[in-house]
């Protein structure tokens, strides 16, 4: 006889640590004279900020940052880095279209509309640009 189930249990202690028992996929328990049951115990740790380095070249990131600053008329002292989101700089959808047009002109590329619409950060733009340049080679 086999029983299929899925469950999730979470226990929290006063020291802000959480023990979580979970089956993310249904578990199969079979009774053939033996008990097959396993639990996955893990302690949740408060999340920490994760910094991810980008795959795009620094030179590309800097060019994209300069174009974004120009298109949005930002002051020279405004910091625009790889992780910077266009929306955080006050860009709306029209501004984003203008940024994409500026990038296409500067790098002599054409971005497909569906890919261009997914760009939200300087890093994403730089990675897409490098991908398109490499495809042209």
UniProtKB/Swiss-Prot annotation:
GO MF terms held by the record: acyl carrier activity
Biological process (GO), any one: fatty acid biosynthetic process
Domain Carrier residue range list: 58-133
Coiled-coil residue spans: none
Protein localization: Plastid, Chloroplast
Entry's Gene Ontology cellular component terms: chloroplast
Modified-residue entries (O-(pantetheine 4'-phosphoryl)serine), positions: 93
Transit peptide (residue range): 1-54
PROSITE patterns named among the record's database cross-references: CARRIER, PHOSPHOPANTETHEINE
Presence of the UniProt keyword Disulfide bond in the record: no
Miscellaneous: Plants over-expressing ACP1 show altered composition of fatty acids, with significant decrease in levels of hexadecatrienoic acid (16:3) and increase in linolenate (18:3) content.
Job of this protein: Carrier of the growing fatty acid chain in fatty acid biosynthesis.
Cross-referenced PANTHER family: ACYL CARRIER PROTEIN (PTHR46153), ACYL CARRIER PROTEIN 1, CHLOROPLASTIC (PTHR46153:SF9)
The protein's name: Acyl carrier protein 1, chloroplastic
């Amino acid at each position: 006889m086999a029983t299929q189930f899925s469950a999730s249990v979470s226990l929290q202690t006063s020291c802000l640590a959480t023990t979580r028992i979970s089956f993310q996929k249904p578990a199969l328990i079979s009774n053939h004279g033996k008990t097959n049951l396993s639990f996955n115990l893990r302690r949740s740790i408060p999340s920490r900020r994760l910094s991810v380095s980008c795959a795009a070249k620094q030179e590309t990131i800097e060019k994209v940052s300069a174009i974004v600053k120009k298109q949005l008329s930002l002051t020279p002292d405004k910091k625009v880095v790889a992780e910077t989101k266009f929306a955080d700089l006050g860009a709306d959808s029209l501004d984003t279209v203008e940024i994409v047009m500026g990038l296409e002109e500067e790098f002599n590329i054409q971005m497909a509309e569906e890919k261009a619409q997914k760009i939200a950060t300087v890093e994403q733009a730089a990675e897409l640009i490098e991908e398109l340049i490499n495809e042209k080679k």
